């Protein structure tokens, strides 16, 4: 019998159509192309195994919350504390108990393509999610820490159903109608918080890209409002916009200046 083509073997391995016994038989195939495919397959399997282990570890807080009798668990995170322009954005998300998304992590550790793909998947599979924007004028009035907390609280309040328990990235939130845990570096420790991190990051980035269309001189589509060299130079050259945060140190001197409209 003529052996299967290398292309056919590659397709079958990729689609998971071969049994373990059939894969073991392929190691006897002397063709270099087949052995190269098997090597790549091994590496992919090892990578998948590591991703599964990481995902299981990131479910530790969730498992404990479920054991304590909670049904709806929310992950909560915010992005945009550091930028000189734009809002701070928080997301809260309730995921089903059997939710799985290998590779989920702190949004800062993901590529833009991954974040966009993950955000779409999370929205499709979430029981509920809510995203809250607190603009720069509020940030300047109450400070960035309080604005971050307000964004988180608004995101949680908008969830339907309301959560029984919240897993929050680092920030303690008083006044919630549910129990909660504030977890240091929670976006790398909890699947729910990581999912909220992704939703918030994608939402804020999209908002800043839209702002770039109105103010293209500041590079908001790439710096997302952060104080890059190019952004600071643009401020020196053109002044500030109505979306800059005067309460942040580099912009104090512009507080009473005429804004660029």
Swiss-Prot record:
SUPFAM superfamilies, per database record: Ribonuclease H-like (SSF53098)
A Gene Ontology term for the protein's cellular component: cytoplasm
Molecular function via GO: manganese ion binding; RNA binding; RNA-DNA hybrid ribonuclease activity
Highest taxon of source: Bacteria
EC number(s) recorded for this UniProt protein: 3.1.26.4
Cofactor(s) needed: Mn(2+); Mg(2+)
Major localization listed first in the record, in broad terms: cytoplasm
Residues given in the record as a divalent metal cation binding sites: 77-78, 169
Record-linked Pfam families: RNase_HII
Similarity-based family: Belongs to the RNase HII family.
Name recorded for this polypeptide: Ribonuclease HII
